[in-house]
Amino acid sequence: MAAKISRFDIHDELTAPPESAPILKGALSGTGKLNNFVGVLASSPAALRGYARMRSELRRGTLPGATQERIALAVAEYRGSEYDVAVHARAGRAVGLDLDEIDSARRFHSRDEREAALLRYLQTMLENSGVVPVHLHEEAREHGWTDEQILEALAHVALADFSSLVTLAGEIPLEGTSREVKPLKKVA
């Protein structure tokens, strides 16, 4: 099987524009390597800074890591981004999601009713260009989601959507995997 090549240049700390260097150094200090998505974003220092800032702020928000990963998995599957599904499946395992819950999140579902209510809200929002019926908003609130958390969830959708769009537009190859994660058929 031939190696998949990105449509965009995949930079490292030596080839990236100088304006991207501070963020790349920060990413390298955390994991010791850059993933292909960050390497691609480095081509645009403004896009890289915007993504890094939004991601950093949202990680300090009120949503648990498992909720953040459920949202990212759902959006990645919705967009058909194999790259993001694989990345967030690994991240989901790291925050305690089991394989069944990862599979459910890819379909905007969860065994946890509270999580499921938020995912239904977000699925409807994506499918209806941002329009969410009042009953789904109220259902999310009845399950304990605050306005702050719902707004953060919407921001996580935007972040995951941006990542999926970049990985799809750039046909960014996934690094370091031993198996591919295929998108599910159609989200039910």
Where do the model's predicted regions map?
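Hydrophobic alpha-helical segments
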Residues: 1-188
